[in-house]
Amino acid sequence: MTVSRLRPYATTVFAEMSALATRIGAVNLGQGFPDEDGPPKMLQAAQDAIAGGVNQYPPGPGSAPLRRAIAAQRRRHFGVDYDPETEVLVTVGATEAIAAAVLGLVEPGSEVLLIEPFYDSYSPVVAMAGAHRVTVPLVPDGRGFALDADALRRAVTPRTRALIINSPHNPTGAVLSATELAAIAEIAVAANLVVITDEVYEHLVFDHARHLPLAGFDGMAERTITISSAAKMFNCTGWKIGWACGPAELIAGVRAAKQYLSYVGGAPFQPAVALALDTEDAWVAALRNSLRARRDRLAAGLTEIGFAVHDSYGTYFLCADPRPLGYDDSTEFCAALPEKVGVAAIPMSAFCDPAAGQASQQADVWNHLVRFTFCKRDDTLDEAIRRLSVLAERPAT
């Protein structure tokens, strides 16, 4: 029997949609995992590590070479310095890092601010910590989405302890601007908040967008836990190698929780990820270019079918509105889509939290949108577009 605070989160929509897609042979544009492998040298390094006996517990904070590689990568790309001995912690994916940060730094009864819509693990880990969620929605901005800084400022109360920020943003594909990040920094400093930043798509930004780590803004280095992962950077979502970077005092809190979640993980994958961080910048750049082209390919196909497609400047995802085709409820639309046309997608309402006050209203606002992933091979995207074209031939109304 599941405890009451976790009953709303018993099964994720991603697991449900992926299982349905597998069962009926649908093209899975719902869950964000690529169908191509990462850098060959990284894959070989993992095989070599296994063959070489790197199969027992690694050090609790992560292997020293990986922590050094993470710190060097942050410095090289973003100009942010971390001591690999005390300010870098290797985790079992970014999801564990997020959970450990909340569990290790947020007291029961305090409030955590979430920007809605949000990745589905945020809300349950806040519940696990015994804290309260307070949501602040993104707002439409032309063909994209933007932060309402005034709404964020109003949401802060004396009980607010932490703020979780995700940019590049899953599910919308928005990338927070320097102006938006500066506003977040000003609010966080004024209210003395801990900020947990989920930056797993930091290298997957397109067009004019630029990823700026919040830790680099004035007053933020001492209060920010920056979380990232090898999964999206190197097409290895199943390896579950993530990390958290931040001031030693905060990282100690994250580690205190993390050590009782998984203790350690992925011993033979850690040297492989270290190698990739040190040597595969060109591979990541090629991945970014490929994803930009695939985003354009999927967006063009959806537009031709009749969807209204929103701009995506980062991540694996874009949002589309099926109302021009006669579908007003994306939850119902996505539930029927696999069997109707053989494609799986995720309703935007899955990223909203109806248990968190005003979020129940926001679920209605977002429920006309659908999230599709474009991190698939061209032939996979083309087949999905071919199947979805049935909707243009037989619209709902």
UniProtKB/Swiss-Prot annotation:
GO process annotations (BP): lysine biosynthetic process via diaminopimelate
The EC number(s) this enzyme carries: 2.6.1.17
Record InterPro entries: Aminotransferase_I/II_large, Kynurenine-oxoglutarate_AT, PyrdxlP-dep_Trfase, PyrdxlP-dep_Trfase_major, PyrdxlP-dep_Trfase_small
Subcellular location: Cytoplasm
GO CC annotation terms, alphabetical: cytoplasm; peptidoglycan-based cell wall
Listed pathway(s): Amino-acid biosynthesis; L-lysine biosynthesis via DAP pathway; LL-2,6-diaminopimelate from (S)-tetrahydrodipicolinate (succinylase route): step 2/3
Annotated coiled-coil segments of the chain: none
Record has Transferase as a keyword: yes
Amino-acid positions noted as binding pyridoxal 5'-phosphate in the UniProt annotation, renumbered to this chain: 109-110, 218-222
Cofactor note: Binds 1 pyridoxal phosphate per subunit.
Keywords: Amino-acid biosynthesis, Aminotransferase, Cytoplasm, Lysine biosynthesis, Pyridoxal phosphate, Transferase
Assembly notes: Homodimer.
Task of the protein: Involved in the lysine biosynthetic pathways. It catalyzes the transfer of an amino group from L-glutamate to N-succinyl-2-l-amino-6-oxoheptanedioate (N-succinyl-2-l-amino-6-ketopimelate) in a PLP-dependent reaction, yielding as products N-succinyl-l-2,6-diaminoheptanedioate (N-succinyl-diaminopimelate) and 2-oxoglutarate.
The name this protein goes by in its record: Probable N-succinyldiaminopimelate aminotransferase DapC
The species this protein was found in: Mycobacterium tuberculosis (strain ATCC 25618 / H37Rv)
Lineage: Bacteria, Bacillati, Actinomycetota, Actinomycetes, Mycobacteriales
Gene this protein is translated from: dapC
